Amino acid sequence: MDQSLKRQGRPKSEEKRRLILHAASSLFLQEGFANTSMDSVAKASGVSKQTVYSHFDSKDTLFQAAIKSKCQSYQLDTQHIDTVSTSGVSFKECMSKIGQQFIKLLQDPETIAIFRVIIAEAGNNAHVAKLFYQAGPDSSLVVLSNVIYDYGKGRIDQSVANQLAVDFCALLKAEHHTMMLCGIQAPLLGDALVKHVSTAVDKISLLFNHSLN
């Protein structure tokens, strides 16, 4: 067990859950979804299999929790995004903050690795691809579309907000994400990252303003 992961003052249950998620994330990346078992997760995290099941009732649930945890580490979960959107910042400022975190998440080596794992396994196991999509991309789109809808203040339909969320993510990914997955593109850093996100924000702002009733 990685002793460096332990922190003072954490409830034992929370600490064990964190250790399980950490071990599971590593195993899913190293072994793939199909070759990772709850037994191996228990062994890697230093807890019993019963303890693993007390936190996650199935491997599917554990896998999705690992994906959601990664998104949360970049403040792209509902709680963090709601905090940004309700802090009084403008639409463009909110989209800029979300966009920069989104790009940083996509460029994270573990994120790239899990995308590659999913692509490799999807042909023989569409189930794991669906689990990943639900916990990661789809969940993020739902949160983002709700933020966009709220900024519309009743002047935009939810269906339009949903499409704008899809459009914004597409603008952020551009060709950069595909090239990153192929290993032929270096991460965007500093001014280059800010410029890339700013361009996407300018475009989605135009679409947003055009969509207002």
Q: Residue spans of the language-model regions?
A:
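C-terminal peripheral helix-coil segments that are non-catalytic and often amphipathic
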Residues: 1-4, 142, 146-149, 153, ...
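Arg/Lys-rich, glycine/proline-spaced intrinsically disordered segments
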Residues: 8-10
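Helix-turn-helix
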Residues: 19, 27-61, 65-69
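Residues in soluble alpha-helical coiled-coils and helical-bundle/repeat scaffolds
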Residues: 43, 57-61, 65, 86, ...
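Hydrophobic alpha-helical connector segments
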Residues: 65, 79-108, 158-168
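Short, flexible, glycine-rich and Lys/Arg-enriched loop motifs at helix boundaries
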Residues: 69-91, 181-191
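Amphipathic alpha-helical packing segments from all-alpha helical-bundle domains
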Residues: 93, 104, 109, 113, ...
